[in-house]
Curated annotation (Swiss-Prot):
Disruption phenotype: Exhibits increased susceptibility to flucytosine. Also leads to hypersusceptibility to SDS. Reduces LAC1 induction mediated by nutrient starvation and leads to weakly reduced melanin production. Expression is significantly reduced by nutrient starvation. It comes from Cryptococcus neoformans var. grubii serotype A (strain H99 / ATCC 208821 / CBS 10515 / FGSC 9487) (Filobasidiella neoformans var. grubii). This is Transcription factor MBS1. InterPro entries: Ankyrin_rpt (IPR002110), Ankyrin_rpt-contain_sf (IPR036770), HTH_APSES_sf (IPR036887), KilA/APSES_HTH (IPR018004), SWI6-like (IPR051642), Tscrpt_reg_HTH_APSES-type (IPR003163). Keywords: ANK repeat, DNA-binding, Lipid metabolism, Melanin biosynthesis, Nucleus, Repeat, Steroid metabolism, Sterol metabolism, Stress response, Transcription, Transcription regulation, Virulence. Residues 135-180, 209-229, 752-774 are annotated as: Disordered. Transcription factor that positively regulates ergosterol biosynthesis and thereby affects polyene and azole drug susceptibility. Plays a role in maintenance of membrane stability and osmotic stress response. Involved in genotoxic and oxidative stress responses. Also promotes production of melanin and capsule and thereby is required for full virulence. Residues 166-176, 757-774 have a biased composition (Polar residues). Gene3D superfamilies: Ankyrin repeat-containing domain, Transcription regulator HTH, APSES-type DNA-binding domain.
């Protein structure tokens, strides 16, 4: 197993490095004519191209259509503004939208008349006149210089040195004349008689004539289709006046040169989704047949089988990814002992894990990880497989990203050569039209997984790349509100500024201003722009309205509306502040009330705790009083029974005549036995009188019992009570001690009322003027 590529890490963070998208490549043939270039792109469409203000402006040769997107770039519109102008004005008329493929060729194409009007409307007609007014002639343009190609990766060169297999590759530098190209075409036509036509012949013939040109990343981040795949019709340079027919030739041993060089360079450009491989598969369908073991068998005459080794492993794996076969190569299912899963399989340094992650093939990812593939391995740009997986929409289309992220999540904190994190690449995906949903899907998956690790998330979510950009600033430039909201909800800082001294907050406000009131350009048109200033941003503000009436409506009317809305906002804000103050005062009063209630509750609790022993004593006193009453009643009852028995005995003695000596007692008994005279009524009246007297005596007896019990309860405190009576009498002045008990209730009520008045006056003094207390 080869060494794992070196990694760069965030400070204090293990396993960290992050990557930038590799620049797209395109096979083209360029001929200079004055300041114009005649260009063939991977689609085979010839165009005239002129660089103006660092923008490649194109005009198709076949129908003279102009690229409206490029015209707006020259006019100084940024991406959000271009999108709005295209939707409002350009796309309502005749137009053709080109998406996919080489980045510069993409955009909205319009007839030359509409393109001229658009250039005039936004003040760039003069500087675009050369490409608009150019008339093709029969004179052949001078030969174009060859475009240099980035050398193969270091790992690839080292492997070639070790195996001693040095490939013979055509020269990548130096001019090539048209005559030389014609001679090469004649040589190819001569070879046609000795070979069988094959769809892959364009690989060899085109490799001998045309070089790859890496496109600067600033122009487009959209990967191109495999650039080396060209049809016969694509290769007919007769369309350029070169009279060069490119026939097919048989794929022979020269395929060894092409397969390891051109094919790997072209295959290194990953597709945004697998459907973009269709053109490659249709051309390569007959040139490579997959055996049950996943090894390509090239069709040719008398080709001896080659030994299988590490060099062939990379070819087999790469062929698997760029073909439509669904059978996984056997070297991935059962890896040989000399199989290195971290070996790069193309000239951009991508490993098999990079390809599998980018294409959303989770099963292959698991096989590679089992074989020892490193999730921290980086390509030439130090991009990790996780970064490559979020640069395309394949994982979104197949809804495989959560499962894939669980396998790769330990590389979340990695950074690449541009100091970009995986969040930068997700936000960068949102810049591509139609990819916002995929970017949101990736972002929400990662943020949900990292929500339990806020410290680590805070370290990486606000990380700045070499341009000072954070993921939030890129998302704000992409005008993706969902991405912006997701990042803000998880702690992204909108005030971090990039090298242009602009923050995400600035981009958001700029977008809102653009939506509400676009800034028109002055009526005076555009001044001359010097050559040195051509590379800088235009010094004028682009016009968004063609007519004067539209400019007036979009100017003064919007200003008046804005002024009224601001006045309404200020009025509403002032009223809201007043309401807020009232609410604060009410809350303060409520807090005071709650405080008083709490304090009173505590006082009641304290008094209750203090009175608890008194309650026990009260119960004890009541128990003693009840016991005393019972004893007194029992004593009285016993005395009554004794008296009654004595009376009965005395009456019995009287009847027996034993009271002879005691006349007084005898007279008393006789009086009791005498019946009143006067009839029955007198007797009943006498009985009623006696009953009443008995009842009165009983009540009086009960009263005396109560007094006796109270006297017993107050026993020992009578002297103290007497002193209290004297003290109260002296305080009242003129009230005798005997009247104190009768006035006690009135005195108590007066004291309670006076206490209540003092409490009220105290609270009023705290919340109002002192005169209220007085």
């Amino acid at each position: 197993m080869g060494p794992i590529p070196s990694t760069r890490r965030l400070t204090g963070t293990p396993h960290s490095f992050i990557s930038r998208r590799a620049p797209p490549e395109c096979m083209w043939y360029v001929c200079m004519f004055a300041n114009l270039e005649i260009t063939f792109y991977d689609s085979g469409v010839p165009v005239y191209e002129m660089v103006c203000r660092d923008v490649a402006v194109m005009r198709r040769r076949s129908d003279a259509y102009l690229n409206a997107t490029q015209i707006l770039k020259v006019a100084g519109f940024d991406k959000p503004q271009r999108t709005r102008v295209l939707e409002r004005e350009v796309q309502k008329g005749e137009h053709e939208k080109v998406q996919g493929g080489y980045g510069k060729y993409q955009g909205t194409w319009i007839p030359i008349e509409r393109g001229l009007a658009l250039a005039k409307q936004y003040g760039v007609e003069d500087i675009l006149r050369p490409i608009i007014d150019y008339v093709p002639t029969s004179v052949s343009p001078p030969p174009a210089p060859k475009h240099s190609v980035a050398p193969p990766s270091k790992a690839r060169r080292d492997k070639e040195k070790e195996t001693g297999r040095t490939k013979a590759t055509p020269s990548r530098t130096g001019p090539t004349s048209a005559a030389a190209l014609q001679a090469q075409a004649q040589l190819n036509r001569a070879k046609m008689h000795d070979s069988t036509p094959d769809a892959d012949a364009s690989f060899r013939s085109f490799e001998e004539r045309v070089s790859l040109t890496p496109e600067d990343d600033s122009s487009s981040d959209t990967p191109s289709p495999v650039a080396s795949v060209m049809t016969d019709q694509d290769m007919e340079v007769d369309k350029m006046g070169m009279h060069m027919n490119m026939p097919n030739v048989t794929l022979s041993q020269n395929m060894e040169e092409l397969g390891a060089g051109s094919r790997k360079r072209s295959a290194a450009m990953m597709m945004e989704d697998e459907d973009q491989f269709g053109h490659l598969r249709s051309v390569r369908g007959n040139s490579a047949v997959h055996t049950p073991h996943g090894t390509p068998r090239h069709l040719g005459i008398g080709m001896p089988p080659e030994p299988i080794g590490p060099e062939q492993y990379t070819d087999i794996i790469l062929n698997y990814f760029v073909s439509e076969t669904s059978q996984i190569p056997s070297i991935l299912v059962s890896p040989p002992h000399d199989f290195d899963p971290n070996a790069p399989i193309d000239d951009d340094g991508h490993t098999a894990l990079h390809w599998a992650c980018a294409m959303g093939r989770v099963r292959v990812v698991k096989l590679l990880l089992t074989a020892g593939a490193s999730i921290f391995a980086g390509n030439n740009a130090e991009q990790t497989p996780l970064m490559r997986s979020v640069m395309f929409s394949n994982n979104y289309d197949m809804r495989k990203f959560p499962e894939l992220y669980e396998l790769l999540h330990r590389s979340t904190l990695n950074i690449d050569k541009q100091n970009r994190t995986v969040f930068h690449h997700i936000a960068n995906l949102a810049l591509t039209k139609g990819k916002t949903h995929a970017a949101k899907y990736y972002m929400e998956t990662i943020l949900a997984r990292l929500a339990d690790y806020p410290q680590e998330l805070a370290d990486v979510i606000n990380f700045q790349d070499e341009e000072g950009e954070t993921a939030l600033t890129i998302a704000a430039r992409a005008r993706s509100r969902r991405l912006v909201k997701a990042l803000l909800d998880h702690g992204a800082n909108p005030k971090i500024k990039n090298r242009d001294s602009r923050s995400a907050e600035d981009y958001i406000l700029e977008d809102e201003r653009f939506r509400s009131s676009p800034v028109p350009a002055p009526n005076g048109g555009v001044g001359k722009v010097s050559t040195s200033a051509a590379a800088e941003k235009p010094i004028f503000a682009p016009q968004l309205y063609f007519s004067e009436a539209a400019r007036l409506c979009g100017g003064q009317a919007l200003t008046d509306i804005t002024s009224h809305m601001q006045s309404l906002a200020r009025s509403f804000d002032a009223e809201l502040q007043g309401k807020e103050r009232d609410i604060l005062q009410a809350k303060a009063l409520l807090t005071n009330i709650h405080t008083e209630v709490t304090e009173n509750g505590r006082s009641i609790t304290a008094i209750t705790n203090q009175a608890a022993p008194l309650e026990e004593k009260r119960h004890e006193l009541e128990s003693l009083q009840a016991s005393l009453k019972t004893k007194v009643k029992d004593a009285l009852k016993k005395g009554y029974i004794g008296w009654l028995e004595g009376e009965l005995i005395r009456e019995q003695r009287w009847e027996k005549g034993e009271l002879e000596g005691n006349e007084e007692e005898k007279a008393a008994v006789q009086a009791l036995r005498d019946v009143p005279t006067g009839g029955q009524e007198v007797v009943q009246a006498e009985e009623e009188k006696l009953r009443w007297e008995i009842e009165e005596k009983r009540k009086r007896r009960a009263m005396f019992v109560e007094k006796f019990v109270r006297a017993q309860a107050e026993a020992g405190t009578s002297e103290q009570i007497a002193k209290y009576r004297k003290l109260v009498s002296a305080g009242l002045g003129g009230v005798s001690t005997n009247e104190v008990d009768e006035l006690m209730n009135q005195l108590l009520e007066g004291l309670e009322e006076e206490n209540d008045n003092q409490v009220y006056n105290t609270s009023a003094g705290e919340s109002g003027p002192s005169s209220w207390v007085q």
